[in-house]
């Protein structure tokens, strides 16, 4: 194709993504669009086609972004090239959403006709507006008995401020309104800007590792073009690679002769090491490099940290490789090696939130067959020492000596909770119990309320989301962003078994709840840790002060079994001998801590308050 033909082709390209709250029908709508444009034959069609991970299908959520090329013949007789970039809806995967949106010019906003706007819909809309995208509202599930499209149309105008007069009424399940959506994409989403005659600039928005072809980059070409045989260069580190293949996904990978301005596709270039490519980097040609890189993404900082250890210590290197491969595919995962006296060698990992942590753990266990122990999640605390230093601490075992601590600050989040009016009391009670500060409350319509609180992140990472869902019968939707660090009365609590600290069981807790938490955890461990041949004290301590204690009674053999009657001194001698043996055992004996003990620390957070 010459330059003129490529420019003509570029005018007919439309790049868009679909944004929605969880369960508002985003993946189903993507399925219908694939069917309507005949991208996938009816034989290959299956529900949630773009959710390629087993985990995504089982949980019914989208975790990874996916990019697909479709051809659509519009009513005006022209054929358009659509690039549909599927995005996750959950708050933990906002980073994936922001990457998807950077590769688009338009976004289809799907809102459930019965439920209306939810907290995460808002969060994703603001991301789209930040990227200057054209937003097309779609009111989905209009065939539900509880659907009220007019109320939702009004909500879109009032809450988000979008003109919803032309919003498409659709039902992705029944296939109603799909063609109207496609026509609106043609009319309203602008063609990609950019010049095919300029030096190549392509934004890497994702990458996957292939055992045969190395790292495969998913890119959006902003300027210029790339074809097999070219030598590409990474603009962040200057490394060069020879392109072996370029192509598109339909969802299957299909090779092409070139990728030109406006295209979304993949580049394979025999990139062997995972570290050579970074999501958000710009690819250019080594022979004619671009003057400057594209504006990438803001780096996401992990919010929740936990230790991951292999149950079998010889799997340590396998775990490292698995984490490196996951990091390639999930740029927001961070990890570094750490050791624990109780658990051996492992990694300290940083996650965006609890669902993210859960998903990473499941992917490690499923895709790489590694059995893991996870320690209790913690957040990043700012510890101001008496020397005037400020330490960032994410691991309780790294906390300095209490005598050297001047003050501790913890991260607070701005939590936005949308909930039906009748559950406002339950939400406020929960937020207060989690040390939340009330900020404001707005009525979205007659029935739904948007409540905003400042809550410590440490309280949210435990089980806030589960408690919120159960106290509102699943009707609440929740979104949060980091607001600020505030001073708090926090202490580090150590758990001692038989007088020895178990580093993996340490945690940070607010002083007001310290006694309660310590007592609860000691009682719980007493039930879980098996009885030994000697008595084992379990203690919860803050510094040198013991705040709770419970003893596991010793197992004892009946040494008097073979004494039938007889002299009492004989019995006493046997009992004294047993007692001396137990004493010696207690002095040198160590206690095995079962894995359930570590998990129980996670789940024990609020049991006392049920």
From Swiss-Prot:
It catalyses: GTP + H2O = GDP + phosphate + H(+). One of its GO terms (cellular component) is plasma membrane. The keyword Disulfide bond does not apply. InterPro entries: EF-4 (IPR006297), EFG_II (IPR041095), EFG_III/V (IPR035647), EFG_V-like (IPR000640), EFTu-like_2 (IPR004161), G_TR_CS (IPR031157), LepA_C_sf (IPR038363), LepA_CTD (IPR013842). It is a peripheral membrane protein. Transmembrane segments: none annotated. Residues 11-193 form the tr-type G domain. GO terms for biological process: positive regulation of translation. It holds the Pfam family GTP_EFTU. GO terms for molecular function: GTP binding; GTPase activity; ribosome binding; translation elongation factor activity. PROSITE patterns: G_TR_1, G_TR_2. Keywords: Cell membrane, GTP-binding, Hydrolase, Membrane, Nucleotide-binding, Protein biosynthesis. CDD domains: EF4_II, EF4_III, LepA, lepA_C. Belongs to the TRAFAC class translation factor GTPase superfamily. Classic translation factor GTPase family. LepA subfamily. NCBIfam families: lepA, small_GTP. Required for accurate and efficient protein synthesis under certain stress conditions. May act as a fidelity factor of the translation reaction, by catalyzing a one-codon backward translocation of tRNAs on improperly translocated ribosomes. Back-translocation proceeds from a post-translocation (POST) complex to a pre-translocation (PRE) complex, thus giving elongation factor G a second chance to translocate the tRNAs correctly. Binds to ribosomes in a GTP-dependent manner. This is Elongation factor 4. It comes from Streptococcus equi subsp. zooepidemicus (strain H70).
């Amino acid at each position: 194709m010459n330059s003129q033909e490529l420019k003509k082709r570029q005018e007919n390209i439309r790049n868009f993504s679909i944004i929605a709250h969880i369960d508002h029908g985003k993946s189903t709508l993507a399925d219908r669009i694939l069917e309507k444009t005949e991208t996938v034959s009816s034989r290959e069609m299956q529900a949630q086609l773009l959710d390629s991970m087993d985990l995504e299908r089982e949980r019914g959520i989208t975790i990874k972004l996916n990019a697909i090329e479709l051809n659509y013949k519009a009513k005006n007789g022209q054929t358009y090239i659509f690039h549909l970039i599927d995005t996750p809806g959950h708050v933990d995967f906002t980073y994936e959403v922001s990457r998807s949106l950077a590769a688009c010019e338009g976004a289809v906003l799907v809102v459930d006709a019965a439920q209306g706007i939810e907290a995460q819909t808002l969060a994703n809309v603001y991301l789209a507006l930040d990227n200057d995208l054209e937003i097309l509202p779609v009111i989905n599930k209009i065939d539900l008995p509880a659907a009220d499209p007019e109320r939702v149309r009004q909500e879109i105008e009032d809450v988000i401020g979008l003109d919803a007069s032309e919003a498409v009424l659709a039902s992705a399940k029944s296939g109603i309104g799909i063609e109207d959506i496609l026509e609106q994409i043609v009319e309203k989403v602008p063609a990609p800007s950019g010049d095919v005659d300029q030096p190549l600039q392509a934004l890497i928005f994702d990458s996957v590792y292939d055992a045969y072809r190395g790292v495969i980059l998913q890119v959006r070409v902003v300027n210029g073009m790339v074809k097999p045989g070219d030598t590409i260069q990474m603009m962040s580190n200057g490394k060069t690679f020879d392109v072996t293949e370029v192509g598109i996904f339909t969802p299957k990978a299909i090779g092409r002769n070139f990728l030109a301005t406006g295209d979304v596709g993949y580049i394979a270039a025999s990139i062997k090491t995972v570290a050579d490519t970074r999501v958000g980097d710009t690819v250019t040609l080594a022979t004619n490099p671009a003057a400057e890189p594209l504006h990438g993404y803001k780096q996401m900082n992990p919010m929740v940290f936990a230790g991951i250890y292999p149950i079998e210590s010889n799997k340590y290197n396998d775990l490292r490789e698995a984490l490196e491969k996951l990091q390639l595919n999930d740029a927001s995962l961070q990890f570094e090696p750490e050791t624990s006296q109780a658990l051996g060698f492992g990694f300290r990992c940083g996650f965006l939130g609890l669902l993210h942590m859960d998903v990473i753990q499941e992917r490690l266990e499923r895709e790489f067959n590694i059995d893991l122990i996870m320690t209790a999640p913690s957040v990043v605390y700012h510890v101001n020492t008496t020397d005037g230093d400020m330490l960032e601490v994410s691991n309780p075992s790294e906390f300095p000596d209490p005598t050297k601590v001047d003050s501790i600050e913890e991260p607070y989040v701005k939590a936005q909770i949308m909930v039906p009016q009748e559950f406002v009391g339950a939400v406020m009670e929960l937020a207060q119990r989690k040390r939340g500060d009330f900020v404001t409350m707005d009525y979205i319509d007659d029935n739904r309320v948007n409540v905003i609180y400042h809550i410590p992140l440490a309280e949210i990472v435990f089980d806030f989301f589960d408690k919120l869902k159960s106290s509102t019968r699943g009707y609440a939707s929740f979104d949060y962003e980091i607001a600020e660090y505030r001073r708090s009365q926090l202490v580090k609590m150590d758990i001692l078994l038989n007088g020895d600290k178990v580093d993996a069981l340490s945690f940070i807790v607010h002083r007001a709840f310290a006694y309660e938490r310590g007592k609860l955890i000691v009682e719980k461990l007493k039930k879980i840790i098996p009885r030994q041949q000697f008595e084992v004290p379990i203690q919860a301590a803050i510094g040198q002060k013991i705040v709770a204690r419970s003893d596991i009674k010793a197992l004892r053999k009946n040494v008097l079994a073979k004494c039938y009657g007889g002299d009492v001194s004989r019995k006493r001698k046997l009992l004294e001998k047993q007692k001396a043996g137990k004493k010696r055992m207690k002095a040198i004996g160590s206690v095995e801590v079962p894995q359930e003990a570590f998990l129980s620390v996670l789940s024990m957070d609020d049991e006392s308050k049920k």
